[in-house]
């Protein structure tokens, strides 16, 4: 997973606008983790904040629990991170969506820390207040979006696992009307 806020400015030009600029990666089979140490060292030597994880699902879901709700709510409201987190209603929606993802991920065997939702909200607050998600920018520009990845997937997973995800259903329905 990658934690960064960036946008395509033109052909061959990507502008980083904020975020921690971190890269998390790992093998599918945790027994292979040591084979990836040279890649981690190479990235770190190049000045990239890279972290190798023996449990590749944990960093993947850690990014998902953060970016899915932020992408959904910023796209729905048209507000950047700072305004979403500063609005009590929007913040409650983001937090509720994070809790829905936590329930689905735990059912799938992801071993989140107990404070994953609060940590994810803190991660969002660390971004520049004017930060927009790539999905929000895609909606603004009329481009194809990541709605299926960030929101529809949770609706489907919740249904398959018997876990209620009413907030994801609501956001999905509203964004589908755009």
Language-model regions: role of each:
Residues 13-63, 68-115:
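Internal alpha-helical scaffold of NAD(P)-dependent oxidoreductase catalytic cores
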Residues 34, 44-45, 83, 93-178:
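NAD(P)-dependent Rossmann-like dehydrogenase/reductase catalytic/cofactor-binding core
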